[in-house]
Structure formats: C-alpha cells, structure tokens
Amino acid sequence: RSLLLIMAPDNLQANTVSDYVKFLRDTSPYINTHRGKTFVLALGGEAIAHANFTNIVHDIALLHSLGKKLVLVHGARPQIEERLKGSAISPQFDQYTRITDSATMVCVKDAVGSARISIEAKLSTGATNSPMHGARIRVLGGNLITAKPLGVREGIDFHHTGEVRRIDHKAIQRQLEDGAIVLLSP
C-alpha cells in the first residue's frame, strides 16, 4: 500500500515565476544526487484504482525523465477481491496469506493482468495532458521473478500460493540500463 508521491510544479501553490524558479533551485541538488540511481516503487492495487492514479503516473514519468532508473512493483488485492466477489468465490486466508485454489487462480490471473495492462497503458501514452506529454517511456517486464509454492504448512494447503524463489537481477539491470521502466507483477 505504498505510494511515492512527488511534488511536481503543478502541485505547488506558487503564483509567480520566481516561486517556480526557487522550487527548481531548491530541488536541483536532490535531482542531481539521485541521477542514475535505482528507485523501487511499490504501487498497491488501491493506487491503481484511485482517482489520482493518472497523477501518480505523471510523477513516475517525471522521475524517469530526470534520469532515475525505476522498478515498479504493483499489487492487485482490491482487483482480485472484486473478481472473486463477482464470481461468488469466497476468499480464503491464513493470517494475511491468500489460499489460492484453482478457481481463485483464474480470478487472480485476470485481476493481475488487468492491473498490469492499466499501468502499462498509462505509462505508454506519454502522460497525455501533462508536462510529460510526448515522452517516450518503455515499460518492460517478463519472467524476472521465479516463485516456489508454499505447499502445505501447519496442515493448510496453500495450493497455488507461492513466495519468491529467485529474482533475475541481471536481466532487470540490463533493462534499466537500456532506459526502460521495469514493471513487476505479483
């Protein structure tokens, strides 16, 4: 449920050019210090569904244009819950871990795929109606994370629920070095 909110000039209460120039002067040391650095941003499914999502995407595009290497890790819990509710499947959890049987997995795939497409589409439009309009942003992902099943724990079969086994750091780094934003889905 983490959001990184960036204060962009559009968000300022500045009424004068001198206020804008002061903002740029005040932020430029931070912009320069973090140029070429990798930022990992977590976007919960709540952020994707929020009315402010377009502004969040504009801020992500701005960070990218300032030379930041971005890895976006997104969630989809509310979208999954919505799909399960629509299919009359009762969600099952042990503690806070979803138990994903085959019927649930259909809803999970649909929700995660839809969330991913929404993020890619917003970023790929070049932030229409924003100062970042026309920016060429490439969003890449793939099978960069390998999972392993949780299996049966304390008598509970978690079916298709898993945890991270391996992350292909080298492939992620190559995509970042090539100027892409890396998008990682659950």
Positions of PLM-derived features:
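N-terminal glycine-/serine-/threonine-rich phosphate-binding loop
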Residues: M7-V71, E177
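Short, Lys/Arg-enriched N-terminal segments with co-localized hydrophobic residues
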Residues: R1-I6
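Terminal amphipathic helices with adjacent charged low-complexity linkers/tails
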Residues: P78-I80
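Glycine-rich loop at the start of a catalytic domain that most often binds anionic cofactors/ligands
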Residues: N52-H58, E82-P91
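Active-site glycine-centered loops adjacent to acidic/histidine catalytic or metal-binding residues
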Residues: G75
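Ligand-binding beta-strand-loop-alpha-helix segment within the catalytic cores
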Residues: K85-I181
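Hydrophobic/aromatic beta-strand patches that form the interior of the parallel beta-sheet core
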Residues: V71, L183-L184
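Short, basic, glycine/proline-bearing loop/turn elements
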Residues: L41-I48, G155-F158, P186
